[in-house]
Amino acid sequence: MKGLTEREKGFEAEFKRNQELRFRVTARRNRLFGLWAAAQLGLPAGEEADAYAKTVVAADFEAPGDADVIEKVRTDIDKAGVAVTERELRAELERAAAEARRQVAQS
């Protein structure tokens, strides 16, 4: 019975690490996506772009999945009159995800 308990603890620890890693990658992805969107919106790099990126990260807490992040950026880009397609948004989100995985793996 003791071996099973230790094994369960090992699985729980691995699950926890995986969830933390997933959270870090997603948050980093959203930040990178937000910085890209800030550039599309013409926001200057630095504090303004960082502040906008934080709003994109926060948008991901509204609902599970990527739809809330895409919708937030899509709405802001449309309001600004910037021509970016849904396909371009999704491609950029995927690029940001790949970069986020790379960055988190290196940290």
Segments from the language model and where they lie:
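A charge-rich, low-complexity, intrinsically flexible signal that marks solvent-exposed coils, linkers
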Residues: 1-107
